[in-house]
Amino acid sequence: MLNQLRPALVLTFALTLITGLGYPLLITGVAQALMPAEANGSLVRKGSVLIGSQLIGQNFASEKYFWPRPSATGPEPYNAVASSGSNLGTTSDKLKERVAADIERLRAAGIGGEIPADAGMASGSGLDPHISPEFARVQIARVAKARGLPEAGVDALVDRATQGRLFGLIGEPRVNVLELNLALDAPRT
């Protein structure tokens, strides 16, 4: 019986070492060698202070900053540990109430006209760091007024921060909120 069991145990042990230890170490080593910033989470630092990650959204509540799309991570917005969608269906009263509250907050901040969909809808992960260029544009007047800047200058920052489709085909144009807000804080020449 042990003769029949030995090959299975050896194979299980060998595959555990290969797939559980060898492969992850190999991929980590290759990633660290070829793209260390991305392998370490695309972290953004100001000097030695960690500001955030280009890959995970964070909450900006000040009038002086562009606001992200709503987070679906529960009572603590942009909590990466609680990453998930809200799982609320399109007919859910809770979803309708949340979207209405988000739109009301935007209206109270002086944003008029048509509100882009991503201003009221969370992403699938609840942590998307991007907003649509349209959502950024409807916030330009609010941010410019709060900072005492000309709208044209803030509009130019939005243009520079807008990323196009991948290979010109995949996805939608998007603006990384953290990068845009850091550009707002950068010294002007």
From Swiss-Prot:
Keyword Ribosomal protein: no
Transmembrane annotation, as ranges: 7-27
UniProt keyword list: ATP-binding, Cell inner membrane, Cell membrane, Ion transport, Membrane, Nucleotide-binding, Plasmid, Potassium, Potassium transport, Transmembrane, Transmembrane helix, Transport
Single annotated GO MF: P-type potassium transmembrane transporter activity
UniProt topology in membrane: Single-pass membrane protein
Main location (coarse class): membrane
GO cellular component, as recorded: plasma membrane
Pfam family, one: KdpC
Annotated localization: Cell inner membrane
InterPro entries assigned to the protein according to its UniProt record, in alphabetical order: KdpC
Top-rank taxon: Bacteria
Biological role: Part of the high-affinity ATP-driven potassium transport (or Kdp) system, which catalyzes the hydrolysis of ATP coupled with the electrogenic transport of potassium into the cytoplasm. This subunit acts as a catalytic chaperone that increases the ATP-binding affinity of the ATP-hydrolyzing subunit KdpB by the formation of a transient KdpB/KdpC/ATP ternary complex.
Subunit structure: The system is composed of three essential subunits: KdpA, KdpB and KdpC.
Family listed: Belongs to the KdpC family.
Annotated protein name in UniProt: Potassium-transporting ATPase KdpC subunit
Species assigned in the record: Rhizobium meliloti (strain 1021)
Underlying gene: kdpC
